[in-house]
Each structure stands twice: as C-alpha cells, then as structure tokens.
C-alpha cells in the first residue's frame, strides 16, 4: 500500500491551503517512465513525492518508486528512509509531500486509494496523490491529476462510519470524496528551448495524426470496465435490499410480539397479576448491523467516470469521423474533375 512510510507527526490543520500543485519536469518524467514500465507488466506503479510547500503552492521537485510488493528482501520503510537520507546528502529536496500511482482505463477511484490517502493526509497534512493515466497518455493526451480528500471524507473515515445515515449527515457522495487540485508543470528555460528544437526536428508525417480513429480498443476497454462496475453495483444493491427485507420482517415480528404482550398484560392487569415489561420482548430482537455503503459509493463513482470518458471519447471520435468524411468527399470530387 502507498501509505507505507507515511510519517506519524501531525502538523497544524492546513485544509484548503493548497491552491495548486507545481511539478518539475524531471519529476513528471520519472513518474511517466515508472508508470509505463509497470503497465507493461500489468502492475500498479506507486511511488513517493518529494518537495516543499511555498505559500499556497505545493512544489513537487523529485520522486522515487516504491519497491514491488512481492520483494520480501526489502523493508519498505527502511528503503524510503534510506533514499531520502541519500537525497538529503546531495542537497536535494527530501521532504515527503505525498505519493503517486498509475491508473489504467481512466479510472483511479478505489478503496485502496481512499485508505492510502487518508493515512497520508492525516499524518502529512499537505500531502496529495498524483494519478497518471497510462492509457490516455499513450494516445498523446498527458493525463496527470492531483487529488486530496475532502474534510467530510476524512471525518467519515476517521469515525469508521460508512452507513447510509453517515453519508446523509456528512453530505458525502462519490463526487465529494476527493477534491481535484490544479496541477502545473514547470520546466527550466533551457528545457523549453530544447523542446522547441526537438519539435522542429520532428518529421512532418509524425506527431500530427489528429484524425486517427483508433477507437476499437479504447472504447472496448471502457465498455468492459463499465459493465463490470455495473455488475458490482447490482450485487451491492441486492445485498442492501436483502438487509432491508430482513429488517422489515424483524420489525413486523417485533410489533406483533409487542401487540401480543400488550394483550397479555391487559389480561394480567385485570387479574391483578404483575405485567411483563416490553424490554423482555425487545431483547429477543437484536438490531441488524447496517451494511457499509462505501464500496457502493466508490463503485458509483467509477461508473460515473467511465460514462464521462465514453461520452467524451465518442464525441471526439464522431467529430473526427465527420471531418474525415468531408476530406474524403473533397478528395473524390477533386479526382473526378
């Protein structure tokens, strides 16, 4: 889990003090390289973010990957402390300001992400989680987003109360679990000059595939993931409906038993006998534990994210399709003439 190595020293409450995240180009390239290397092995890439807070800006100046979970020869916390100690010796920012992880098929919201960010944010108040979408970035759209847990989500997780009543009281939904923080990438002037020169050296037939309609695999992956999430949400709904049916049946039996007891007590009273207290009947019906709704909330958020990505992707593909059709018709008309 990404909460490995999170420090346990609380600082002052700094909620809503991080207005934006500034990430150096070097840190971005290291994150991108690590995430793409792990995506080839179908693994989830995770790592630590290093930097500092300046005014209301969180500056990320460096990062390093976490060791793989299957590596039993390396202690995670010792590894992180050793890396930060070496960085400090060479005068590199070594303050732990968050963590990053890769995301596939454009969906990063999960129970593990929520739990890890909770541990980070309650021990390092200014920490953020940076999510890099490998699939979308491989199509030419750099997708790098920073998130923080909202105060309501932190309070709910702190109370460990994920019942429907808690969600209503705190007004928490899948759209209010995380707050997205604007992220900007900063490069040195020399880096910008080099990138401009590289752009001029790029062949004309490369890097301008704006009308590429490669929709099959992307749309298929999104649809498959959407169907899986809908099935999971259906199973959660079935479990909750069964709970409601059991509660309704129990309440009916309890009211029937109380009515019977009231009739018996009326007979006892008429005979001058002591009545039986209602608590004797109520004790026979133990309250059913309310199922947690956190998993269903996260699944709903995943469904919403997939639906948004599908709608956005389809609108872009349709626009490309109509443009391509117009160009093809113009080409055929020109050939006829």
UniProtKB/Swiss-Prot annotation:
Q: Name one Pfam family in it.
A: eIF3h_C
Task: From the Swiss-Prot or TrEMBL record, state where the protein is found.
Answer: Cytoplasm
> Which keywords has UniProt assigned to this entry?
Cytoplasm, Initiation factor, Protein biosynthesis
CC terms in the record's Gene Ontology section: eukaryotic 43S preinitiation complex; eukaryotic 48S preinitiation complex; eukaryotic translation initiation factor 3 complex
Q: Its Gene Ontology biological processes?
A: formation of cytoplasmic translation initiation complex; positive regulation of Notch signaling pathway
Job description of the protein: Component of the eukaryotic translation initiation factor 3 (eIF-3) complex, which is involved in protein synthesis of a specialized repertoire of mRNAs and, together with other initiation factors, stimulates binding of mRNA and methionyl-tRNAi to the 40S ribosome. The eIF-3 complex specifically targets and initiates translation of a subset of mRNAs involved in cell proliferation.
Q: What is the protein name for this chain?
A: Eukaryotic translation initiation factor 3 subunit H
Identify the InterPro entries for this entry: eIF3h, eIF3h_C, JAMM/MPN+_dom, JAMM_MPN+_peptidase_M67A, MPN
Per the record, the major location class is cytoplasm
What are the residue boundaries of the MPN domain, all occurrences included? 21-153
Q: Quick check: keyword RNA-binding in the entry?
A: no
Self-association state and partner proteins as the record states: Component of the eukaryotic translation initiation factor 3 (eIF-3) complex. The eIF-3 complex interacts with pix. Interacts with mxt.
User: Member of which family?
Assistant: Belongs to the eIF-3 subunit H family.
> What HAMAP family does its record include?
eIF3h (MF_03007)
Q: Name one GO molecular function term.
A: translation initiation factor activity
What is the protein's species of origin? Answer: Drosophila grimshawi
Query: Per its UniProt record, what PANTHER family does this chain match?
Result: EUKARYOTIC TRANSLATION INITIATION FACTOR 3 -RELATED (PTHR10410)
